[in-house]
Amino acid sequence: MVSALSFCDLKGSSDQGQAQHMEDEATVPIYERHAEALYQNVVEGSFQEPHFSGLEVQPPANPQNILSRYQFGRILGQGGFGTVYEGRRLEDGLEVAVKIARKPWNMPYIVIPGHPALLPLEVGLLILVNWDPKVPQIVQLLDWQDQPDYYIMVLERPSPCTDLSNYISLFRGTLHEFVARLVMWQVTHAANVCSARGVLHRDIKMENLLINPETLEIKLIDFGCGDLLKESAYNQFCGTEDYCPPEFRTEGRYHGNPATVWSLGVLLFRMVCGHFPEPIELLAIYTGIWNQSGLSHECCHLIQCLLQQDPSRRIGLEEILPHSWFQVLSLRSATNGLEEVFTF
């Protein structure tokens, strides 16, 4: 899946190929050329995105087409179902990211309160998680449009930022426990908000977390693997293999929130240990004897609570933030010197 918003290294299965037929560039508006180039070879499964060079490209005004409201810059990332572009809103100069995604033949649609028409699943999920009160830890959907063969999403583009994977690489692949706790609090809060609003992200990982390197503020992005949260089990896995819950491997099914808890455990382990958990480490965690030199007892205990192989023994999603590791957490803004203290 293509990331809903990736500013650094968008992951996804590449489906590139030389476009076989394009309209004459001198006569066709840029947004129409883009749509044609992106979707003309859907049947053949081969397409190539046109590359816009710089923000000087300005599509003609057209109130019927959302793309006419923005200038386009470089490609931020692309994958099997579309491309994310750097953009700027013509109305006020706001920097945005524009995702243009082609629709698969079995495109899922949903209906949500306040929107009687069918919505593309990813659009609907983002609308749900962006209900008021909005939370800064989840990327905001600013605008969207549904077309017969593709849908378009305009999302906020914070600056400065990088994805968490790139950020961790600056520190030899491991974060200090205090920094990891700041990150973990924000990601867990975002996951709780998603759950409370009926959304299952299903792909919480470092590449889908944007971090401001100055303030350490986090944003959860890319709901392309998401689904509506339900009480019954899911029998199809959509996400990243390294974060796949063990119950899906053994039973072919999983429940939403316990799977989210597992992915949060993998994320925390990866941040503070520098690698994904090995089978022997998971066995030690399951038996309660795992420990990591240099980490606090509370951090090790939380990891053991998160990475229980049996989902019935796993900590509940709503129980993570009250854990003793988060009893007092200070989040300092490097830009304005303000300090916000979270106590649980």
Regions found by a protein language model. Give the residues of each.
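Activation segment signature within eukaryotic-like protein kinase domains
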Residues: 183-184
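Terminal C-lobe "cap" of eukaryotic-type protein kinase domains
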Residues: 309-313, 317-333
